[in-house]
């Protein structure tokens, strides 16, 4: 899906996980088109990736290197042949919810040269230790210095009515806080709620791509 008019090779790219949700259950096309016309979002290319089913989703999204290698080496070149986009990391957003939020940050931390902007909503940062009694894998990697968020722009959003996820997101935000100029933290009055996610997705894209408007001015 593409929006607006711009030099094709300069268009930013957004990779949205859970295609079937954003394409069918709660379509984002009208909002993306409207925000682009109002110059709140730049003309862009949007790639929506289908989770297939819950089993595939649970296997492919949580911190799965093979999944993201396939996206970069197989999927994106095919997309680019149809709808050219920029290769710049600072123009590329990867966005997801729950396991998708975890996956989005995983992609940014492990391939920052490709995915420079992360939009995580209700990210499952407890993974793989459900219950909240042990730190999740990504937080452990950040604390040990195995990965770094330096240079990334990150939106973190979680709801007050999802306590385990909120706790994990707060711990992650505390770890990322030294990078506060490039971290957007939002605590919403909701739970694991698609209605909250839709509005947060739009605002997150606006926040992450705002510097592009300054680049063009």
Each model region followed by its residue ranges:
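Non-catalytic cap/lid and distal C-terminal segments of serine-dependent acyl enzymes
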Residues: 1-217
């Amino acid at each position: 899906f593409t929006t607006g008019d711009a030099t094709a090779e300069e268009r930013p790219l957004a990779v949205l996980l859970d295609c079937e949700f954003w394409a069918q259950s709660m379509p984002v096309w009208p909002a993306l088109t409207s925000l682009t016309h109002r110059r709140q979002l730049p003309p862009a290319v949007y790639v929506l990736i289908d989770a297939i089913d819950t089993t595939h989703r649970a296997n492919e999204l949580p911190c799965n290197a093979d999944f993201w290698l396939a996206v970069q080496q197989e999927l994106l070149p095919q997309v680019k042949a149809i709808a050219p986009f920029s290769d710049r990391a600072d123009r590329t957003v990867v966005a997801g919810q729950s396991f998708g939020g975890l996956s989005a940050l995983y992609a940014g931390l492990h391939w920052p040269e490709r995915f420079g902007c992360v939009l995580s909503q209700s990210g499952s940062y407890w993974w793989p230790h459900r219950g909240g009694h042990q730190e999740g894998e990504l937080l452990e990697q950040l604390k040990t210095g195995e990965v770094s968020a330096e240079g990334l722009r990150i939106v973190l959003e979680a709801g007050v009515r999802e306590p385990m996820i909120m706790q994990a997101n707060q711990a992650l935000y505390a770890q990322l806080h030294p990078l506060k100029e490039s971290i957007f933290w939002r605590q919403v009055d909701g739970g694991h709620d698609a209605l909250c996610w839709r509005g947060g997705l739009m605002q997150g894209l606006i926040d992450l791509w705002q510097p592009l408007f300054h680049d063009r001015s």
